[in-house]
Amino acid sequence: MLYLSQTPSLSSIATIPRLNNRTFRPRTIATLQTIIIAARLGKQNLLSLSPIVTSSRLYAFSSPVLPMSLSLSSLPDGKEGIDRQIKQQKKNLRRMLRLRLGNIPQDDIQRQSRLVWDNLFALPQYHDARSVGLFLSMPRGEIITDQALARVLGDGKTLYVPRVGLDFEKCEMDLIKVEDRRSPNDAQDPKPFYHDWPRNKWSIPEPPSDVSRCVAQRGDIDLLVVPGLAFDAAGGRLGQGKGYYDRFISKMREDDGGSGSPLLVAVGLEQSFFEGDTPQIPMSDKDLPMDIVVLPNRSLHVESSR
């Protein structure tokens, strides 16, 4: 039996269609505590957690929890079984986190984004970087990068932005050097440099093939800003599930002799961070930990690998 430190409020749970034979239509979604428990149990909705005991301080669930960290002997088919379990846990987490992040009001995301960029631009690693890789943000549910893109260019740094292209099945991306140094705040041309770029299947602008042929090679990017659905204090990251960043980073580091370049700086919303001193996000040996995690209220430097 698993006990939480405090009772999840019904108003915070979006995926419970029924509880104690009553119907609820809550306004927001589950706390991260509840989400991670459901993911560990392999549940698609929180009804299957079967609440059985409540008190003013404790909330109990009857299902056993599969630990995030598994030994090779804990599953009959060894590492393959562990990899399958991790994959399923991540799938469950993504499903529920997309609901959680998609319900954050846009004005709150804008507020948090400003704080995140203030923290990132204060990092000595940013000041020392000659080149920065930075994503263009999705319409909802993640840190907004519009002003950050302008700031990087305004600081005289070389900027690289992602391009996935049309072959989505390959799940590969390049980072393309931005030649245009216009700022969205330029009085003569208020439009951002990417205003006429085509949008991909996620409604994210990306460089067309004729904008620039300068594709980032090993050693070109000093600092890479990485998005994600969730992060933890051990540098764990949960991405969208396609592996674009993991493949790109692995290629850059492999080509660079495994030197650790570029520096990986994750940026996340308050609602995307899993508290705790130990790893909270399930990761396989193919998943790469972040070096720094930047949040609205702090920056976490990951001291050791997972």
Describe these PLM feature segments.
Residues 97, 134, 159, 225, ...:
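A residue-level signal for conserved active-site and pocket-lining positions in enzyme catalytic cores
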